[in-house]
Structures are given as C-alpha cells and as structure tokens.
C-alpha cells in the first residue's frame, strides 16, 4: 500500500458492499484503494445497484461521462457514490458500446442524478433511457445535435457550425424579460419563476451561458499535469484554492505520492482562510439583500484583513499560485504566524459583536425565518452539500467524513440545524467562521517542521513523468459552499478525463422546492441563501400562471466568482 495507506484506514464494511456488487449484481472490481473502490456493472443492473447504495446511506456526488472509444470502443459513465458515514467512495462504472450508446437512467431512484445525466447526454452523447425528455442542460439551443464537445474526436478549439435555435420558452403575452443576455448583466443567468398572485408555484433555471470548457482544456495538449493547478484555481474567483487542492490531491493519489506534512498543514490553513473570507462576503451580501446595508458594509470591512492575510500567505488576495503537485511554493514563518494570530483575534471579537447584532435585527429574522425551507428528506434526495445540507439536518462535511490533509489534527464542531430555512443557512455560516478561526489556531500551534515539497517533485523528475497513464482518482475537499469533487482518469502526460463538480452544481436543483409556496419577495434571499457561485444573478423572469403576464425582477447587485466550467 505504501504512501496510499496514509489517506484513510481500511473500512470493514467496504468488503460487504463489494461482495454485493460483484456476486449479486454481476459486477467486477477494476481498481481499488483505501478511500475508493471502482466496480463495473452491467447496464441492466445499474438501477438496482444505485438503489442498493442509496438505501445503504450513500450520497451521489456526481457522475462522469468518458469517451473511452480510443481504449475499448465504448463510452462509460462513472457514478461516484459517497459512503460518507464510512469514509469511502464507491465508483460504479457502466459501459455502452459506441454503436449502442445508452445507459439506464437512475434519476427515479436517485433524484440527485438529474443534472449529471443530462450533462452526459449533452457533452458525450450518451442516451439516458427511462427518463422524461427535457431541454438541454449545458449546450445552447443553437448547438448542432450530433456534436458532443467532450468526445475525443472533437478538438478543444473546435467551432461548430451555426444551426437554427429551438425556442426554449413560450413567449409571454405581455412583458419584456431582461436577461439572460443584456449589457447590464455581469454574467448571464436565467431564473423563470411561475407565480399565482405573489406566491411562487414553480421555478426553472437555465445556466451555463458562459461555459468555458475547462475540463476539455485540461485534456488538451496545451495543458500538462504541471499546468492543471493553474487552470483549476481559475474555476472560481472565491474557491480557487480548494479547486487547485482537489485537482492536486487527485494527481498525487494517481502518482502514489503525498505532500509533506508541513505542506498539508499550510494547505489546510489557506483553505480555512478561504472559507472565512467567502462566508464573510456572503453574510454581507445577505444583509444587503435583506435591506440592512450597514451590516453589509461592516461585514466587508471586517473581511478586508482576511484578504490581506491571504496575500501574506499565498502572495495573492485570491489565493492563487501557492499549490503545486507534491507540496506548496511558500512557507509560513514565525512572523507570518504572529500576524495571522493577531488578525484572527481581532476578527473574532469584531465579528462576534456584528453577528449578534445581525441575527437580532427584526427585519432579518422576520424575512429569513421560515422562508426558503428545504426539508431533510428533500436535501437527502438531492444530495445537497455544504451549509445548505447542514442547515437541513444533514451531517455532511468532508473534513470530518473523509479527514484529508491536516484536518485530523484539529478538533472542531460541525454546525447543524434542522429548520432548513434561510435563517438556518445564515447561522450555519456564521458559526463556521468561528470554527475556521479555531482550526487555524490549532494548526498553527501544531505546525510541524520539515520540507514543503515532496522529494520526487523536483526539476530532476518532471511531475508529468510521475503520473502513469491508466490510473483513477477521486479527490474531495470541503469548499465554503460545500463538497468540491474532482474525478481524474490519467493519460500520457496529461489527464485523459478530468471531471469537476463544484458545490453550487449540486445545490442549484434544490432551489425549486425551496422557492415553491413562498412569497415572491423572498425569492432573492432564498436564491442567495445557497451562495450560488456565479457572478451577479441580477434578473429573474416572473410569469403569472393564470394570466400569462410576465415581468422581470431584480435579484441582487454584486456578485461572486463563476463556477461555469
């Protein structure tokens, strides 16, 4: 087992799961390590396998479609199930021959599979049988039907011919929607809210207008393994470090190496700094949405020293440039430790006073309490992550479930609420700020000595030569918005397939049950409550289901970094 045995202890229950999948469902193990087991099952058994894993407590993290025709003349769909309570993942592979490219849908037994199945259809061209037909998820309506961008015969710089677009929405009888394409929008996003009077009865979302093809770029000749961290940290303007950390952990697993302990501590410290500044940003935005601009300004004032700390530790306010395969570029010396501790002491005191004030403001409690409710069963069905899950009573946090990096050396609690409303999501994030401060203090106190780069990762041995082809790895880290997941299938000198699942991708489908039955006036806060990772969702189209009349409402100003992959 070597270096890999340091990732997670072997789980005795995993053997029973593997036995069930192989003996009862006709599967076979294609790869295994302590934290992961990959099992290929026949197409006809997929739905029963998914039902068994789901009923055993698994959450569907995502599914990754892969064009394996150059390897075995077939397509494949990898379903990543997380056995969170046991601390390991079961990756279920199902293959589809290129001349019969279909797999059964599992969305009726695992609703969380909805988006990733549609993405597999759009990007690879796999037919999902047994589910209702819906419009495209990722590709625009004027994209040619027979071109699927993540197939290996489509180059990364391919420009498709234009075709006549199909109309997505019936035109309203009256009203002119502004968005998703409008000069006043920082980035285009589209919400369609159906209302009766002033009550929301249903909601639809159309995103991916600025899909950047990052996964395709990562597989292209332009990017080697050494360049992937640079690309990964640009997935999101807020969660850049957690994305680069996830990508790097996957590559380190595939290479059979692990960063030195000191480097892991430094990564964990930066991840918590990132969580603090992200949560403070969100709390300020929430105060603004609720009409309490004094709270917005004070929260962002308190946040600014955290940005200065980020620059002190990483060299960049956006935490870019620190991560490398095998370690980190910069160390933390005694002077930096003193500055971090002093800044966090002041931050803790100021934010405690502000947080007590915020949650006591009558208009905040009245607007946030009892609105945007997501029940525990709904959260479970959709496999939501992060503060959204924990506010609905789901005890999900990768730092506890799959203790990675230095988190096993820190003692901290996971804020948990059962109300599932907007106020609960506010309180989870407020408490997490204090927990992150506590984690950083502990890690600084326990910061070990030693190198910050693995001995194999040097100029003498290029990183691209350390990662052999044909390996699999799944890496996950707890981003501010929830679990971030990267799936890696290695190729020659670069990824064969690199799948990224940002937390907002998992949480946006939950907005539909959260918005239903609530007053239209509360929709902006409910949408903001998941901390959606796209820049400036400024507009929503509102349609009265009785009259057909449409109008456009403004959601909020400002914005955060995009996670449109």
Predicted regions and their residues:
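Terminal low-complexity/charged segments
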Residues: 1-203, 278, 343, 364-371, ...
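Metal/cofactor-centered catalytic core regions of large enzymes
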Residues: 43, 111, 141, 153-565
């Amino acid at each position: 087992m070597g270096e890999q045995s340091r990732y997670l202890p072997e789980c005795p229950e995993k053997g029973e799961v593997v036995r069930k999948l192989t003996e009862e469902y006709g599967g076979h193990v294609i790869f295994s390590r302590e934290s992961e087991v990959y099992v290929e099952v026949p197409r006809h058994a997929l739905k029963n396998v998914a039902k068994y894993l789901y009923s055993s407590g698994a959450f569907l993290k995502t599914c990754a479609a892969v064009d394996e025709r150059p390897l075995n003349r077939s397509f494949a769909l990898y379903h990543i199930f997380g056995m969170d309570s046991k601390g390991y993942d079961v990756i279920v592979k199902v293959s589809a021959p290129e001349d019969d490219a279909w797999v059964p849908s599992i969305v009726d037994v695992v609703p969380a599979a909805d988006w990733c199945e549609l993405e597999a259809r759009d990007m690879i061209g796999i037919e999902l049988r047994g589910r209702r037909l819906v419009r495209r998820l990722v590709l625009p309506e004027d994209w040619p039907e027979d071109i699927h961008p993540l197939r290996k015969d489509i180059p990364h710089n391919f420009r498709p011919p234009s075709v006549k677009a199909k109309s997505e929405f019936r035109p309203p009888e009256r009203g002119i929607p502004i968005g998703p394409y409008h000069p006043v929008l920082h980035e285009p996003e589209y919400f369609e809210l159906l209302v009766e009077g002033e009550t929301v009865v249903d909601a639809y979302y159309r995103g991916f207008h600025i899909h950047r093809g990052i996964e395709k770029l990562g597989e292209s000749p332009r990017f080697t393994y050494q360049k992937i961290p640079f690309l990964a940290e640009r997935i999101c303007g807020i969660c850049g470090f957690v994305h680069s950390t996830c990508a790097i952990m996957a590559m380190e697993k595939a290479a059979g190496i692990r960063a030195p302990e000191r480097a892991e501590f430094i990564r964990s410290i930066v991840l918590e700094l990132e969580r603090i500044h992200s949560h403070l940003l969100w709390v300020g935005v929430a105060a603004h949405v609720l009409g309490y601009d004094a709270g917005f300004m004070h929260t962002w004032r308190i946040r600014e020293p955290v940005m200065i700390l980020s620059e002190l530790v990483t060299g960049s306010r956006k935490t870019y440039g620190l991560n490398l395969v095998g370690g980190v570029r910069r160390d933390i010396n005694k002077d930096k430790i003193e500055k971090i501790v002093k800044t966090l002491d002041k931050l803790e005191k100021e934010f405690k006073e502000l947080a007590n004030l915020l949650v006591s403001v009558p208009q905040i409690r009245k607007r946030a309490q009892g609105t945007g409710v997501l029940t525990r069963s709904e959260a479970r069905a959709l496999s939501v992550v992060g503060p959204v899950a924990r506010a609905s009573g789901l005890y999900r946090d990768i730092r506890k479930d799959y203790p990675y990096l230095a988190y096993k050396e820190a003692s901290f609690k996971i804020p948990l609420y059962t109300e599932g409303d907007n106020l609960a999501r506010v309180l989870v994030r407020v408490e997490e700020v204090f927990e992150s401060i506590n984690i950083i203090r502990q890690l600084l106190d326990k910061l070990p000595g030693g190198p910050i780069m693995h001995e194999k990762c040097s100029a003498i041995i290029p990183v691209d030569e350390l990662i052999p082809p044909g390996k699999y790895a799944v890496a996950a880290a707890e981003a501010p918005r929830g679990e971030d997941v990267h799936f890696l299938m290695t190729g020659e000198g670069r990824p064969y397939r690199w799948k990224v699942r940002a937390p907002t991708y998992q949480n946006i489908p939950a907005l539909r049950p959260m918005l239903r039955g609530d007053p239209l006036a509360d929709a902006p806060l409910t949408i903001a409550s998941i901390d959606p990772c796209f820049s400036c969702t400024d507009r929503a189209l509102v349609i009265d289901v009785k009259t057909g009349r449409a109008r456009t409402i403004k959601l909020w100003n400002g914005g955060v970094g995009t996670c449109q992959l």
